[in-house]
């Protein structure tokens, strides 16, 4: 009879290179990760900011990769957890990790731009490490707000530049220039070619920009428990024009 640990090790190898490191019955899936025991090391820094008891709650994990955060949510008692990604390799890894952990989690091949197809609003939506991989990050935030976020929204993005924030005035004179030179002004850096040898890294915000994007999409920031992580609540848009109304007109 085959050793269960040997079977897990064989299957982990078959599933290719892992980005999420798990301990699956003693088998590490990404023991040489350049970020260390990732994403466990990051999770430890903001786990306290997520409700410990998710009994009866639904969770959507957007860009779930191998399902680390989906599994953490299930461990906290979430009734329904759905993870979506567009990379079938990662989804296969996620299904295997959930199976080894004895958890029922639904993993689907679905883009963030198609979340309306879920036809469901979730009590908690995770958006971890996705924004900077998207060609259209604000559109993604708008779609999440419109179609799937019922209450809590936890977002994480790689950040570069200044970590300081400023109170941005509601309007600027046409001839104003100096404010845009300030390091703390919201900035979204465009990566034309590659970052960290990854051609899918398109944008890198500074902290002021990430916060502003979240607010612009209709999310009220409740907590900032980790340098890249923001816990938000869905709010009503307060601007003079709801950009989603324009989007609906365009797509009709």
Enumerate the language-model features and the residues they cover.
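S-adenosyl-L-methionine-dependent methyltransferase catalytic module, highlighting the catalytic core
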Residues: 113-115, 122, 126-127, 131, ...
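Conserved N-terminal segment of class I S-adenosyl-L-methionine
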Residues: 1-121, 170, 176-178, 207, ...
